[in-house]
Amino acid sequence: MNDKDNLIFNELVVVKRSGQRVNFNSMKIAIAIKKAFDNTGLEDCEKKVNKVYEDVLSYIRNNYWDRKTINVEDIQDIIQAKLKDDNYENVYKAFSDYRIRRAASRKAFDIKSQHKFVKAIERIVFESKKNITSKPNEVLLDFGKTVSCEYTKAYVLDNKFIRAHEDGSVYIHNLDYFNLGSLSSTHLGFNSVITDEFPLNIFCTAMNAKNEIDGEITISKIDYLLVPFLLRRFREKFKEKLNKYLDLEGYLDYINFKKIEELIDKEDVINIDLDIFNQYILNKKVRNIFEIAYADSVKKIEELLTVSLERLLVSLNNIITENKKYAISLGTNNTKIGLMINNCYLDVVGKLDSMKNVTTIFKIKKNGDNCLFDRVSELVIKGKNIVFANLDASYNKDKDNEVEYFSNGKRIFENILCDEKNSIGRMIVASVSINMSRLGNRNSDKTKSEFYLELDEMLELTKNILIMIFETIGNKSKENYQVIFNNNILDDDKLESGQKIRKVIKKGVLNIELASLSECAMCLEKDKEKQKKLVKEIIDYVNGQAKKYSIENKLNFVVSETSKERPLKKLIAFDKAIYGIKKDVTDKNCYLRIDSMFNFKENIKNDFKYIGEYQKSFSGGNLVNVYLPKNITVKKFNELLELMIECNVGFMRFSMRK
């Protein structure tokens, strides 16, 4: 739209059925037309939506330029007329029928929120009839989600927040669930559940926690987590084997076995120095018995560990729920028992065919264990679901704790409430994505200061949405949850009966996500190198604002990049309806992540350096996926891991080209 058009529309006032007067908003027209096309089941109709949208605006421009008001019914009449003029008969009929049903619904339900409920339920029924493969439990789940979502829209969130979500300016994640108290991705503690029933107890905790967490659950540092359990089982097995073998050879009556048991119980490592038993070793044959008993015990523990890990991974991967994502991190415990856990785990991953629902997060450090590097590299080349977290990245280093990522690159580490950095027992409380491409489109012919002014408005809106979600969840009490606040969340032991969970979840993070950041840069800059630098500038700016919000509100605001396909598809669909097909911006089915700006081929070191700079500013992390050639060797892949460390890249996924 040119300046003259903007002037006409800026001065036009829409009169609603209730008599309320609001400013003319062309985006609502685009969304109404898009919904009409969507309800007919037509696919790839963005160009058609945009054409009808432009025709409607043209009609209003030509016929209302000298008027001050337009009725909402008149706008709908114009949409209906243009659908007919453009020969979209099915859409015209669907839109006409929709208006008739809405009129009947408004008569039946006086309250606006009730009317919206009916609209939402009708939409589910329509979708279930259209999709003949819908199962009864899936339709029932959709009904439940819709009721929860519409209740949240009607009674919980502010109208301006809902408008921003529904016009594609932002995307509120977990909108279906957060009012019920559901938390997002969480690094559960698990410290209190590693008993002799492993892996059943971990599996049950992880599975039951899914009823309270809408997101990924990570089992962090499993190569440390299992150590106490394995040491306990090793000591039991070593005493059992030693007793049995000494008895078989007739030595048991001549040795104070109780003292030997006491020595074994004092050991906190698996690589026991048998010389501590010298006073009880009567001869070479007895020493040989000790050596055999020790070796057999270690072997039994390895077998137990392998079987248990396989059961755990298979069980987690095969959970039949709507949200079934898990991650397991490991890789840095270089003790004998730690290496045993790492090697057994990698053996199991190598043996299992498909692990789509369980991601392995392998942690790497400079001068790490080369044997493990080679093993994990072989698995990645075979297509296993493994991602890498670099603990030596400048922003991940800490002398006391290891950083933990989720499989989508999201990160929790810093904590505004204390000096200690940590991840385990913390969660993403809520996430809201800002449609950066929309901002870029609107400011493509404006100054950079105007762009940042509008970005500030969106950041303020996003901050307020996140705070409202935090307060809604924080008002739940400990009794609303059965699993996650039972020694699985940081400081949940301080929660008393009946107490609100606010003081515990405030140690989690409120996630400001930037969606379509690369497309935003393309709208604002034509030169590709300048686009890459602009992306860094924008991330730095938003991160600075997030730090300010954290200090002002004593809450942990972080900045990350949107990686989920669903919001990226929804946002681009809105923008296609409004702006049409724009080269390199809306000429695809889904907005892209910023790693799409790099090919990771000709100048891969320079590309990695850019990624390292981006991730240093993304306090909440981002996902980078590098595609590998089919013929890559273990040596070449290890060089990529070393380059990742050298270039300060904190998190990366490597995928084989198909």
Model-identified regions with their sequence ranges:
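Predominant activation on well-ordered alpha-helical scaffold segments within soluble catalytic domains
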Residues: 27-34, 50-57, 61, 76, ...
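Glycine-rich phosphate/pyrophosphate-binding loops
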Residues: 524-530
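Conserved catalytic cores of very large enzyme subunits
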Residues: 101-506, 532, 536-658
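Charged, amphipathic alpha-helical regulatory modules used
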Residues: 2-120
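Short, hydrophobic beta-strand segments
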Residues: 56-63, 326-330, 519-524, 622-628
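Alpha-solenoid helical-repeat scaffolds
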Residues: 23, 46-50, 69, 295, ...
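Conserved phosphate/anionic-ligand binding catalytic regions in large, soluble enzymes, centered on
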Residues: 426, 504-521
